[in-house]
Amino acid sequence: LAEHYGNPVSWLDGKQWDSVMNYDAFMEPITWFLTGMEKHSDDFRQDMIGNTSAFWGSMIYNATAFSYPSAAVAMNELSNHDHSRFLTRTNHKVGRTNTLGPEAADEDVNKAVMREAVVMQMTWPGAPTIYNGDEAGVCGFTDPDNRRTYPWGHEDRQMIDLHKHLIRIHKENPEIRDGSLRGIFEDYNVLVYARFNTEEQTLVCVNNNPQPVTRQIKVWEVGIPKETVLIQIFSTDEQGFSTEQTEVPVVAGKMEITIPATGTLILKHGKAQAEDDEKAEKSPIRNRRWNFVKFS
């Protein structure tokens, strides 16, 4: 696995590298979408925050460099040794330690946006990779400031617990690890995508607006029966996160949901729901691995 800037396609022919640090088809699109920041904190663009069209365009275009095996093990990082910490990017401060000072990296950060990013990291195709300290709330500008020591005794315990729960969700749901990906709804600052295989589906809903949003979402296109119940298994908001489970009905192939302000929802339709639903139809969707489908 290599660190590479630019299109890696010539290196991913099966004879050289297995995969790369996934800047172009993960770190950069998610950073622009959620924070409007360049990954070194060298630029801020208001027009990129919540720009779902730019997000999907970048993701799909850059994913074409990967074969499925390379995509499945691509190192999906939010931060690393060469770039500012993702949590620092949430404060929209343009600069580095030599211009702003290290203290500025910790100022006005938005942990709710960080939680959104971790939810996406743990549910996106590839290998979620945590840069040491991200899970504990470490901040920092581009190196060397991003290489701060681990904050022993001063960790953000809620952020650590968030990572633990999301890692468990990643491990326990095969459709998240190696299923297909499809975007099923987009709006300004609102993104809904599905990870699915022939038997199970997980929906991830992201709202980067500072207020809750309620939307009707078509879900039948990813193999979810038109009359069934989804289980909300995880959520985040401006205060933290919740693992409380609630039922969300699907009527005529659509669900109505309210996504918290600067928050996320993860919803699941699995074997248990299909078995309990007398009206469940056999899914017509085949498992097309690394199937980057946008919107029908």
PLM regions: where:
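Conserved alpha/beta catalytic core and glycan-binding cleft of carbohydrate-active enzymes
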Residues: 1-143, 171, 177, 181, ...
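Carbohydrate-interacting/catalytic domains
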Residues: 110-111, 123-130, 134-296
